[in-house]
From Swiss-Prot:
Keywords: Amidation, Disulfide bond, Ion channel impairing toxin, Neurotoxin, Potassium channel impairing toxin, Secreted, Toxin, Voltage-gated potassium channel impairing toxin. SUPFAM superfamilies: Scorpion toxin-like. It comes from Androctonus amoreuxi. Disulfide bonds join C8-C28, C14-C33, C18-C35. Potent inhibitor of voltage-dependent potassium channels, with a preference for Kv1.3/KCNA3 versus Kv1.2/KCNA2. The lineage of its organism: Eukaryota, Metazoa, Ecdysozoa, Arthropoda, Chelicerata. Coiled coil: none annotated. InterPro entries: Scorpion_toxin-like_sf, Scorpion_toxinS_K_inh. This is Potassium channel toxin alpha-KTx 3.12. One of its GO terms (cellular component) is extracellular region. Negative results: has no effect on Kv1.1/KCNA1.
């Protein structure tokens, strides 16, 4: 995935930031959001 500069404690927190970044499937890895490009 693509790491974005958004801190997180759970993957659910990455859904919106990833959508806002034009991507999908947010996952929280090492307290940072990682997104899957469309």
């Amino acid at each position: 995935g693509v790491e974005i500069n958004v801190k997180c404690t759970g993957s659910h927190q990455c859904i919106k930031p990833c959508k806002d970044a034009g991507m999908r499937f947010g996952k929280c890895i090492n307290r940072k959001c990682h997104c899957t490009p469309k």
